[in-house]
A protein has these predicted regions:
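N-terminal export/assembly segments and adjacent metallocofactor-ligating motifs
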Residues: 1-249, 257, 261, 265, ...
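N-terminal leader/propeptide and maturation segments of large enzyme subunits in energy/redox metabolism
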Residues: 81-86, 249-285, 362-377, 381-386, ...
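Extended redox/cofactor-interaction regions of prokaryotic respiratory oxidoreductases
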Residues: 127-199, 204-210, 234-238, 279, ...
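Flexible glycine/proline-enriched surface loops and loop-helix/loop-strand junctions
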Residues: 180, 221-222, 271-275, 304-309, ...
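Long, contiguous, secondary-structure-rich segments that constitute the structural scaffold
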Residues: 484-542, 604, 608-624, 628-711
Length: 711
């Protein structure tokens, strides 16, 4: 009491509209900061954002738990002679990194040092990282984890349409389509808020078809589930086109007016008769026919693919086969119709548009195109001849670490490559062989286990930045609070390193918005043209769809209504004969193995494994085993099962489930160490996209004792 009055606790609140740090749906959220004796953050779904409309998954609701987590790295660390990481000043850490980079490049050449980026980086960070590698490092070697995610869909769409945007229409079109096929996407778990559009489509009388080796939560919602053998997606897609042709379901007028190359495709699918397709894929002829009739007969229909058909050594061709089908049915470019890809990472779309990929420059330009190089060189104020050529793709880049002529130093931004890569045991060994490994992240993870330097970075709510969601909608993620003392943003780290490498003049920006202004100019005239987009415009319009080539342009929510982006203006059919996965079951390894996600976790788990509520819900990976296979192996629910491939072995807890095929095992890939599913997976690469074959490999299994480890 003072002067007879009670003490009153002062409470201040401030609410910021921003976006989730996880998947490409990029749910709108509001974060309310309440300050009393301490600061608390309350996260809610934004009811006014038109993509998620007030819905959000458990990952989004718990995302603030990451910001003040006790395991967070809050100061730079260097690994000393003892082999342990120790806290150092920023000056010491940055000087060390720059000195090591210069020494390695002096000894081994400019390409000996590279960077690995992320689909979690904002557009500004992706842009500046690409510029940093090519201008400050003068190295060709940059790629990002989107190569593990979107590369096959991107290559397939570019081949057919001349452009790559995950969805060529707004997500709201899903609710309007009369027939929806979800191919290899368990979006009920991987992107739960999108299901409101799927359920709305069903409630309006639309048909839902799901293609997946597992009876997932998504498949349970479907009128028709095609439970195919892993790795046979390409044959099934070709088989559906065969049926469409045989039964007169194709749109010959559309094919003549808007496409080219159909005759080659027609001839290529003549061997894909339904009986043959059933033998190889396991999908009954009746279901094949039902699926193609639903797509063909509906006034509007669309196919949306996920990682299932894409993360294969023939992923690009499989995407082409899906596009071939929808072109032949005359659906692409029509209302609520066509083909689309459900992008995975938060900025998986924007991350590949602005220079993180080994072969690309900002605006979806190509590094080996002389005119494209000249445009970017002018923006960056460098000689086009000084820009390096195309570098190695993600897995090839990592596989070169420590090898003759390969990487000697690597800077990793926002990616846990030791868990996310196929044949991850190989990558872990290669990381340990580097002369310099720098990990820029908010938490230590499996990749930083052998890092020479760990540089702490700001998190999603601690800086402004733009991202591009699965629709091609550019959005503005607003800062909620300042980063903790001792933490820098990725943009600041790149600027400091560039200065120490003698190229600081092109990296001194006062804000992310200033970086975006340069990005706008860099993308002008490109396929992914952001030149008409500004921070102000994004806030006023709930995001803007690219291309947006001028300040007065409203953006482009829908593509292909009048023409495609190839020089002819037509879509291109591509003949894609079926071929087997790189590794099939045999007598030594008689089972298929495939991977996927849990609703509660995200990608390598580097973030979600730090959130108590998510770990309480899903504390460990479990291997799905069909009851018949479990009986044959002699295991029951909760037993330990040792799963082995030619690359490694993992001991999983068993989950008995009739949702999986009896010839297939499934496990999630969110864990590292001895629980890493990617110890088993196959590094065979798609010849076009360089996507690894995560989704298909051969394994064997037997009961495991509690003391058996992994290798």
């Amino acid at each position: 009491m003072a002067n007879g009055l009670p003490h009153l606790r002062v409470v201040t609140t401030e609410t910021t509209r921003t976006h989730c740090p996880y998947c490409a749906f990029q749910c709108g959220m509001t974060v309310t900061a309440q300050q009393t004796t301490h600061r608390e953050l309350r996260v809610q779904a934004d009811p006014d954002f038109p993509v998620n409309r007030g819905q959000m998954c458990i990952k989004g609701f718990t995302s603030a738990a990451l910001l003040d987590h006790p395991a967070r790295v809050l100061a730079p660390k260097l690994r000393g002679a003892s082999g342990k990481l120790s806290l150092v000043s920023w000056e010491t850490a940055l000087d060390y990194v720059a000195e090591r980079v210069l020494a390695l490049q002096a000894r081994y050449g400019k390409p000996s040092v590279g960077a690995f980026g992320s689909g979690a980086l904002t557009n500004e960070k992706a842009y500046l990282l690409g510029k940093f590698v090519r201008v400050a490092l003068r190295s060709p070697n940059i790629d990002y984890n989107g190569r593990y995610c979107m590369a096959s869909a991107a290559a397939g769409q570019n081949r057919a349409f001349g452009i790559d945007r995950g969805l060529p229409f707004p997500v709201s079109d899903i609710a309007e389509t009369k027939a929806l096929m979800l191919w290899g996407s368990n979006c009920a778990e991987t992107m739960p808020p999108i299901m409101q559009w799927v359920y709305e489509q069903k409630n309006r009388g639309g048909a839902l078809i799901v293609v997946d080796p597992r009876r997932t939560d998504t498949a349970r919602a479907a009128a028709l589930h095609l439970q195919l053998t892993p790795g046979t997606d390409l044959l099934l897609a070709n088989g559906l086109l065969f049926l469409a042709i045989e039964h007169g379901l194709i749109d010959r007028d559309y094919i003549a007016r808007r496409t080219q190359g159909f005759d080659d495709v027609r001839r290529s699918v003549l061997t894909c008769d339904p009986a043959h397709v059933e033998r190889i894929t396991g999908v009954p002829i009746e279901q094949q026919m039902q699926a193609v009739r639903l797509l063909a007969d509906a006034e509007s229909s669309m196919v949306l693919s996920g990682r299932g058909p894409e993360q294969q050594s023939k992923g690009t061709d499989t995407v082409s086969a899906l596009i071939n089908l929808m072109l032949a049915l005359g659906k692409v470019g029509k209302p609520a119709s066509g083909y689309g890809c459900l992008t995975g990472q938060g900025n998986g779309q924007g991350g590949r548009e602005h220079g993180q990929k080994a072969d690309q420059l900002p605006g979806y330009r190509y590094i080996e195109d002389a005119a494209h190089r000249a445009h970017i060189a002018e923006i960056w104020r460098v000689n086009p001849a000084d820009l390096p050529n195309k570098g190695k793709s993600a897995y090839e880049l990592l596989d070169s670490m420590g090898a003759e002529g390969g990487l000697r130093g690597l800077l990793v931004f926002g990616s846990n490559v030791a868990v996310a890569s196929p044949h991850s045991g190989n990558i872990t060994r290669k990381l340990a062989a580097l002369d310099l490994l720098v990990v820029c992240d908010a938490f230590e993870n499996e990749t930083s286990a052998t890092a020479h330097a760990v540089l702490p970075t700001a998190q999603w709510a601690e800086e402004d930045g733009t991202l591009t969601n699965l629709e091609g909608r550019v959005i503005l993620r607003r800062q909620v609070q300042a980063p903790p003392p001792g933490v820098k943003t990725d943009l600041q780290i790149l600027a400091e390193l560039a200065k120490r490498l003698g190229r600081g003049e092109g990296f001194q920006f006062d804000s992310p918005e200033q970086v975006f202004e340069e990005l706008r100019r860099a993308t002008q005239g490109g396929k992914a043209d952001y030149s008409g987009i500004s921070y102000e415009k994004l806030e006023q319009n709930q995001g803007v769809f690219w291309p947006c080539p001028s300040n007065s342009h409203p953006g482009t929510p829908r593509l292909f209504a009048e023409r495609f982006f190839l020089a002819s203006g037509r879509a291109q059919f591509t003949a894609v004969p079926h071929r087997n996965a790189a590794e099939l079951p045999d007598t030594d390894y008689p089972l298929f193995f495939t991977t996927g996600r849990y609703k509660e976790h995200y990608n390598s788990g580097a973030q979600t494994r730090h959130v108590p509520a998510l770990m309480d819900a899903k504390p460990e990976p479990r291997v799905q085993v069909h009851p018949r296979l479990a009986a044959r192996l002699g295991v029951v629910d909760g037993d330990l099962l040792l799963v082995e491939s030619r690359r490694g072995a993992v001991r999983f807890s068993v989950l008995i489930s009739s949702d999986i095929r009896a010839d297939t095992l499934f496990a999630p890939f969110h864990w590292g160490g001895r629980q890493a599913a990617n110890l088993l997976t196959m590094p065979a690469l798609d010849p076009i996209s360089r996507m690894p074959e995560f989704k298909v490999c051969a394994v064997r299994a037997r009961p495991a004792s509690p003391i058996e480890g992994t290798h």
